Swiss-Prot record:
HAMAP family (UniProt xref): PIMT (MF_00090)
Active site (UniProt): S60
Keywords, alphabetical: Cytoplasm, Methyltransferase, S-adenosyl-L-methionine, Transferase
Catalytic function, reaction form: [protein]-L-isoaspartate + S-adenosyl-L-methionine = [protein]-L-isoaspartate alpha-methyl ester + S-adenosyl-L-homocysteine
Keyword presence, Transferase: yes
InterPro entries given in the database record: PCMT, SAM-dependent_MTases_sf
GO cellular component, one term: cytoplasm
The organism of origin for this protein: Xylella fastidiosa (strain M12)
Gene field: pcm
Keyword Transferase: yes
Function in brief: Catalyzes the methyl esterification of L-isoaspartyl residues in peptides and proteins that result from spontaneous decomposition of normal L-aspartyl and L-asparaginyl residues. It plays a role in the repair and/or degradation of damaged proteins.
Chief location bin: cytoplasm
Entry protein name: Protein-L-isoaspartate O-methyltransferase
Pfam families: PCMT (PF01135)
Length: 210
């Protein structure tokens, strides 16, 4: 169930659910999601659903990946920071769109698996094993920042690493109630917020695990 027909069906579903950016849809059609999950779940790779990847983490639902990617692509970013590498799928989507991707993962085993997938696909992504809530100051500022786990509030440390004209997209809230929030730093340096969608993400946790 990794055929082009199955991928096309997923893309059509995403289009029906409101995803309009054809660059995003084309990239989701091309990037092999089945390589980012356990072989036992391969038959479900192109369903529009989140799937477990171990360590209490998930690979996000394709619609969420598309929605977040579409939101950051609206500001035409060149350099993006991702907080929470997970399986590496979202990173691969961003890199395949031609972005310079920096990604941070707190769980060492997940990051090692993701790096192996990046090498397998020939994708250049800079990655770091660290607490994502601190960002990656050495390469800041970023045109876009994408957070793939939910914190109770937007994290000031990450906002500070956002370039003028840049956009941060992140789930915000508690385990029982979350919303996808879009923050944009305007040309005059002020910050605008917009709530995009109700969502459900795993929690953004502090510290590091091997």
């Amino acid at each position: 169930m990794t055929s082009q027909r199955v991928r096309d069906r997923l893309v059509e579903r995403l289009r029906e659910c409101g995803i309009q950016d054809e660059r995003v849809l084309s990239t989701i059609r091309i990037v092999p999601r089945h390589l980012f999950i356990d072989e036992a779940l391969a038959l479900r790779a192109y369903e529009d659903t989140a799937l477990p990847i171990g360590h209490g983490q998930t690979i996000s639902q394709p619609w969420i990946v598309a929605r977040m990617t579409e939101a950051v692509m609206q500001v035409a970013p060149k350099k993006i920071l991702e907080i929470g590498t997970g399986s590496g799928y979202q990173s691969a989507i961003l890199a395949s769109l031609g972005l310079e991707v920096y990604t941070i993962e707190r769980i060492g085993k997940l990051l090692r698996q993701a790096r192996k997938r990046f090498r397998q696909l020939g994708i250049k992504i800079r990655s770091k094993h660290d607490d994502g809530s601190t960002g990656w100051t050495e390469h800041a500022p970023y045109n876009a920042i994408l957070v793939t786990a939910a914190a109770p509030t937007l994290i000031d440390t990450l906002i500070e690493q956002l370039a003028i004209g840049g956009r941060l997209v992140a789930p915000v809230g508690t385990a029982s109630e979350q919303a996808l929030v879009q923050l944009t730093r305007t040309i005059d340096g002020s910050i605008t917020h917009e709530i995009l969608e109700p969502v459900t993400f795993v929690s953004l946790l502090p510290g590091m695990l091997d």
